[in-house]
Design a protein with these regions (language model features):
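ABC ATP-binding cassette signature C-motif
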Residues: 4-105, 159-396
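Short, polar/charged, Gly/Pro-enriched helix-capping and turn/loop motifs at alpha-helix termini
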Residues: 104, 126-129, 146-149, 153, ...
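Intracellular alpha-helical coupling/juxtamembrane segments of multi-pass membrane proteins
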Residues: 93-146
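Short, flexible cytosolic linker that couples an ABC transmembrane/permease module to its adjacent nucleotide-binding
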Residues: 148-164
Length: 396
């Protein structure tokens, strides 16, 4: 099979192998974590940490940048500013600088007002004329710091369920599915509770996407069943949105069909939150960029007001500001979330339960955070047992 026909993750791995071959003096990486699963990203992090030569990397993955980078080059305000430290240090430092400039300007403005009031009051007073003149000179010396508007724009992502979710959310019983002769799901069973935010993890990308498609009603299982609770309403963010955007329909018209309020101004409000300004709402669906498509789908999820959200790789094509906004929206959401995501920080800060889909189609289910899951010896032993059982089946 030609490289062009391979999945995105395989293409990235081939490009990485090409870049890493020969131990280069300078390694240039432009979004190297795109399409890689969390295990592959973890391997890349460790490799780059131990790489002795220079690395220049562009990435939207905050956790990756924190692990790998020793310096951050901030491209904003029409210039580049270099910071020593990782991503979190840069973020805190850059925010602190802006806050300090604003506070300094505020004090200067207060001083300007005080001087202007004195000058206006006493400039015609002969006994105070020298003081007024002195204050005029002081006023002329005060210069406000120029705070240029940042090129960074943060969307406003706020998922508000219209109905509170009940105790019975989702029951999955014995689901199996074979695709192209490979059993990607093998007797999968789990129950979702009303306070769950579950991350689907593991290198079996097809298993995760297949599970989402089944739960969204887009695919029938070969065996088993699932049942949503009567109080639930679901919104689904698909990994592949090709068919959704294969239309000449306008964004605002397409989005209106998912809104109970059939008012263009109301719908445009949701688009505005997602940085679609002015006439952007009358763009045709098929001409949108990858990032715009993601923001339209997130607008749909907000406007639907569901109490169960399902995300299959929502951070693909998003910039760091949008990922941060999505992360915050997921954390604040009071309903249930089922999601797969390659962004370590999104998984760690959102999930309170981990379901790992293994290569043999089985799963591991654990109520824990993602970092605790990775550090757990118990989970490592379980993965080894499943891996050994898969090897035995292959030998037979």
């Amino acid at each position: 099979m030609c490289i062009r026909d391979r999945p995105g993750a395989v293409k990235v791995k081939v490009l990485l192998a090409q870049a890493l071959f020969g131990n280069p003096d300078i390694l240039l990486l432009d979004e190297p974590t795109n399409h890689l699963d969390l295990d592959a990203i973890s391997w890349l992090e460790e490799f780059l940490i131990n790489f002795e030569n220079t690395v220049i990397v562009v990435s939207h993955d905050r956790y990756f940048l924190n692990k790998v980078c020793t310096n951050i080059a901030d491209m904003d305000y029409g210039k580049i500013q270099l910071y020593a430290g990782n991503y979190d240090f840069w973020y805190e430092s850059s925010q602190l600088i802006v806050r300090q400039m604003k506070e300094a300007n505020k004090k200067k403005e207060e001083k300007i007002k005080e001087l202007q009031e004195f000058i206006q009051r006493f400039s015609a007073n002969a006994s105070k004329s020298k003081q007024a003149t002195s204050r005029k000179r002081a006023l002329e010396k005060i210069q406000l710091d120029e705070i240029r508007p940042s090129s960074r724009k943060y969307p406003y992502i706020d998922f508000r369920p219209e109905r509170e979710i009940g105790n019975d959310v989702l029951f999955v019983e014995g689901i199996s599915k074979t695709i192209d002769g490979v059993k990607v799901l093998d007797n999968i069973s789990f129950t979702v509770n009303h306070d769950d935010k579950i991350a689907f993890v593991g290198g079996n990308e097809l298993a995760k996407t297949t599970m989402f498609k089944i739960l969204a009603g887009e695919l029938e299982p070969d065996e088993g069943s699932y049942k949503w609770g009567v109080t639930t309403s679901q919104s689904y963010f698909p990994k592949d949105n090709t068919t959704i955007f294969d239309t000449d329909e306008l964004i605002v018209d397409w989005l209106t069909q998912y809104s109970e309020i059939k008012d263009a101004t109301y719908v445009r409000g949701f688009l505005g939150r997602m940085l679609f300004a002015g006439e952007d709402g009358v763009k045709k669906m098929r001409v949108l960029s990858g990032g715009e498509k993601v923001r339209v789908l997130l607008s749909r999820m907000m406007i639907m007001g569901s109490n169960v959200l399902m995300f299959d790789e929502p951070t693909d094509h998003l910039d760091m500001e949008s990922i941060t906004a999505l992360n915050n929206g997921m954390i604040k959401f009071p309903g249930v979330i089922l999601f797969a995501c390659r962004d370590h920080q999104v998984v760690q800060t959102t999930a309170n339960r981990i379901i790992e889909f293994l290569p043999n189609g089985s799963m591991i289910d654990k109520i824990t955070t993602y970092d605790e899951y990775l550090e757990s010896d118990e989970m490592a032993r379980k993965r080894q047992v499943y891996s050994m059982s898969e090897d035995d089946e292959n030998d037979n």
